[in-house]
A protein has these predicted regions:
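Membrane-interface helix-boundary motifs at transmembrane edges
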Residues: 117-118, 167-175, 225-238, 294-303
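Alpha-helical transmembrane segments of multi-pass integral membrane proteins
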Residues: 53, 211, 215, 219, ...
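Signature aromatic-anchored transmembrane alpha helix within multi-pass, membrane-resident enzymes
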Residues: 181-183, 235-251
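Interfacial loop-to-helix junctions that mark the boundaries of transmembrane helices
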Residues: 47-50, 205, 236-238, 269-272, ...
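Internal transmembrane alpha-helix with an interfacial aromatic "cap," most often the third helix
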Residues: 161, 218-231
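Cytoplasmic membrane-interface segments at the C-terminal ends of transmembrane helices
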Residues: 73-80, 228, 289-296
Length: 391
């Protein structure tokens, strides 16, 4: 990433473009996976499509990296750690995630009522989704009538719950904290794997303990990046080029792991055992490109803009595509078997264009109508609170 210059631009240790790059890649991969499931058109290499669901793991990695980066930077610079105020942290996270999520949930509820009507099961399903606990109950997780992709918000919510305690501990004693997180995932994995093939396994392999090691990799990546991202070496061209080359090598490693994941006979079993190698490769991409050559300004702005859309895109893409295909029956089709199942390649191509266009347009609309206004409200609230404390 970037262009060769005699004096490379400084490493952006506050917000590396590599984080935006990986976020766009992860969200795009998840979107490509779900859209491919509906139209069967292979617009990407097939192994990237078949293994596209692992992009969720990279989003979890990025959450840990980005949230912990201010702590890592303070630790690397010998500055006081950020103030750990759980209430303020929870308020910011809620303002960031919940408005767009609840709008999406309202739409999915309307669809569920339209398709099946009200029921006691739907009420319990809705209650779990409103409280971000949907992944903890079978009927609101794999049996949900609402938006199926939002199970990840349970994982994020549990991480946010412990982050105010975890961040200062990890900044002061990184090795023990990171080791314990990895141990939790390893022990949980060894407990869950023997249940592969049972109905219980589908409920287990994506639960929060199965991501604790992923969170550790994200926080470790932040510590490494913050420690290496300053100093005289960052002003020399050769080492920065070397980091960019290492980032490309990490991408090749990532591609090989995706190929292995896509070809696994026991896909979900391998997904659990292959999770740490995949996030280690993604973490290497993040750190190496972050320390490498800085991309040109237009590229950075484009990546930042696309990354800003990733949350709304993630929330809406699958539910929207299924709605367009089966409820609106677009592109037009009749009968009981969708055209992709009949090998209609012209329909597949048209569907691919329509589904991507709809997902992107709705994501843009939701970002500007929901996410951005509430982000502005959050900033104003924070400024008022700080002004009140200063009096």
């Amino acid at each position: 990433m970037g262009v060769l210059t005699a004096a490379p631009a400084p490493v952006d240790t506050a917000r590396p473009a590599a984080a935006d790059f990986l976020r766009v890649l992860a969200a795009g991969l998840v979107g490509a996976f779900h859209i491919w499931q509906q139209n069967w058109r292979a617009a990407l290499p097939e192994h990237w499509l078949r293994a596209g669901c692992v992009g969720v793991d990279w989003l979890v990695l990025l959450s840990a990296f980005c949230l912990f980066l201010p702590w890592a930077n303070a630790s690397a610079q010998g500055k006081p750690l950020p103030a750990a105020c759980p209430a303020e942290f929870y308020r910011r996270r809620a303002m960031r995630l919940l408005p767009a999520y609840y709008i999406n949930l309202l739409f999915s509820l309307a669809l569920a009522v339209y398709r099946r009507g009200w029921s006691r099961a739907l009420v319990w399903d809705l209650a779990a989704h409103l409280t971000l606990t949907q992944q903890l109950f079978p009927q609101s997780y794999i049996g949900t009538q609402l938006n199926g992709v939002t199970w990840t918000l349970t994982v994020f919510a549990l991480f946010y719950l412990v982050f105010p305690l975890l961040a200062p501990l990890c900044a002061r004693r990184p090795l023990p904290v990171l080791a314990w997180l990895c141990i939790v995932q390893a022990v949980y994995t060894q407990w869950a794997l023997p249940q592969y093939g049972s109905n219980a396994y589908a409920l287990l392999f994506n639960q929060f303990p199965a991501f604790c090691g992923v969170l550790a990799v994200g926080m470790a990546a932040a510590l490494i990046f913050a420690q290496l991202g300053r100093g005289a070496w960052t002003q020399r061209l050769a080492p920065r080029v070397g980091c960019t080359v290492l980032g490309v090598v990490a991408l090749v490693w990532l591609d090989a792991l995706l190929r292995a994941q896509a070809g696994a006979a026991e896909f979900q079993r391998f997904q659990l055992t292959n999770r740490m190698p995949l996030v280690l490769a993604a973490g290497a991409v993040l750190v190496c490109f972050g320390l490498g050559l800085t991309p040109p300004r237009p590229v950075r702005r484009a990546l930042h803009g696309l990354a800003a859309l990733s949350y709304s895109f993630y929330l809406w893409h699958q539910m929207l595509v299924v709605f367009i295909k089966y409820d609106l029956q677009l592109p037009a089709w009749q009968g009981t078997a969708p055209p992709n199942q009949l090998g209609n390649t012209a329909w597949m191509q048209c569907a691919d264009r329509l589904y991507w266009a709809a997902a992107i347009l709705v994501s843009v609309a939701m970002y500007f109508l929901a996410e951005k206004p509430f982000a502005g409200l959050q900033n104003k609230t924070a400024q008022k609170m700080h002004a009140g404390k200063a009096r």
